[in-house]
Amino acid sequence: MTKEEYLDFCGSIAGATYDQPFNEDFQTTALRHRDTKKWFGLLMLHNDRWIVNLKLKPEEVLFYKDIYKGVTEAYHMNKVHWITLYLDSDVPAEEIEDLTLRSFELTKSKDKKKTKKRKEAL
């Protein structure tokens, strides 16, 4: 999967948005919840390869690291809850999309009142 294909997919997720949050770095892209701005992923260029950090359940982190060479410990994130996935690896596009949706669900705001107030403020 290419960076462009991946960002197109992320842009199609209802309630998702993305931006480049770091000054002077126009390649790193934060994948966010539109209402809370909370990250569900971080897309980066690392050693000339596109990677994305995604949140999973701890048991899923271990599982996916075991079955795919393209899934490793998270780069600059909590290694118990986050993975790094290489977009150009042995991980099929459908699996990348599924893992992205899982991360999106796991990082949703759990406080519905706060989310509602944030939406009203927008």
Where do the language-model regions lie?
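Charge-dense, helix-prone N-terminal extensions
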Residues: 1-122
